[in-house]
Amino acid sequence: MKIIFFLTAIMLPAIAFSQNLNQKATDQKKNNEMLIGYCNRDGFKTIDSNFDSAYLAEYKVYRTDLATMKLLSQKLKGVNVTLVMATWCGDSKEWVPRFYKIMDELNFNHKKLTVICVDREKKAPGTIAAGLNVDKVPTFIFYRKKTELGRIIEVPSDLLEKDITVILSK
């Protein structure tokens, strides 16, 4: 009986969270599906839009800067990232796959990544998005020990991996 209670106590939050992951809504402007709320990469292929094909194409062709990646790999310890993005957004279609490519090559623990997909008003009910003061997407927010280190808003000023390295060097 104790085992059943223990397993229920552990599994119930996971089940509840997973039911709120990769939720779909209709983009009223383009009349197609978009992701809304907490998401992960698996959600990209579940919506009826061109986000997944754009994601896959950009991920495949993007080449990271090896020297910067070596530097960046030394700065990831204790880092958490919140990504606020939109599957309807052209900049998200370009920069989100590049971000994932960088993090994949660095073997970043994706459990330390929170992805929030927003609507055209930059809202995502049931998430922390409202408290993040995001006006443009994608916005990459980097934390260490719950302290915000910096953001990349919409488009990096240099290579994405270089901007991340600058932020994590603080």
Residue locations for each model-derived region?
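Bacterial Sec-dependent N-terminal signal peptides
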Residues: 1-23
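Non-globular targeting/processing and membrane-anchoring segments
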Residues: 17-75, 165-170
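Thiol-based oxidoreductase modules, predominantly thioredoxin-like and allied folds used
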Residues: 81-87, 110-124
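Non-catalytic, surface beta->alpha helical segment in thiol-disulfide oxidoreductase systems
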Residues: 136, 141-170
